[in-house]
Amino acid sequence: MIQISDYHADSVPGLIEEIEHESPDIIVSTGDLVHDTGSYTPGVRLCKHLIDIAPVYAVTGNHDLWRSDYEDFERELTAIGVKTLHDERVILKRNESEISLSGIDDPFALNSVKIAENIENSLAKLPRYNGYDILLFHRANLFDRLKYRGFNLILAGHMHGGQFRIPKGRGVVAPKSSWGSKSSMFFPKYFAGHYHAPHTDMIVNRGIGNPMLLPRLFNRPEITVITLKHKKEI
């Protein structure tokens, strides 16, 4: 599986070739395929290439939903075969095994109470599932609200790797749209990489583009390559 997040770019040389080289079974996007301003054509163009490599599943990010023409953008994604998960899950089967891939919409609001309400409303729409369950969700900073909700793995983005990275250390700056969720502007708790809680793991993708006026420093763009193994193979 390949995870991408926070594309925020017109084009990225070598990106498609790198993803194709990994031969993923599926590709997932954890939000912000496009910026909230400008054309959404780069996001469509990217997905046209991705869908030729593997099935593509996506969830919304804040920049996606801030666009007045987001519905037009999603219609174009649907037309080329991208499945956007709006508070729903799909069952993926391979040989005799299956997993659930769930996705909920970005819960953007201006205060933490409304954000929590939006998350609860989204989770309530997901049908019950007793097997291995992966959640696609944009905002890594909200992991504490999700880590005890029964998901085995949460894939997230939004934090842009902390924008600046202290060498061998933490990310420094959180996106402005994280602040209403009681997340600190500086040195956010979750910014990139692998985090573990009892029964749940979260992988935070650093993102590809840069929507902020600040440059990325010690914080290279990334795609995340994830290999799931059956218990019998471990």
Place the predicted regions along the sequence by residue.
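Conserved beta-sheet core of the metallophosphoesterase superfamily
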Residues: 139-224, 232-233
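Catalytic metal-binding/acid-base residues of hydrolase active sites
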Residues: 8, 34, 63-64, 89-90, ...
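Conserved acidic residues
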Residues: 25-27, 54, 131-134, 152
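Binuclear metal-dependent hydrolase catalytic cores centered on His/Asp/Glu-rich metal-binding motifs
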Residues: 75, 79-82, 94-136, 143-144, ...
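Membrane-embedded segments
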Residues: 2-88
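Beta-strand-turn-beta hairpins that frame and shape the catalytic cleft
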Residues: 1-2, 90-103, 130, 196-202, ...
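Acidic/histidine-rich helix-loop elements
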Residues: 1-13, 33-41, 64-71, 109-114, ...
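Active-site-proximal beta-strand elements of phosphoester/diester hydrolases
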Residues: 1-8, 98-108, 134-138, 201-207
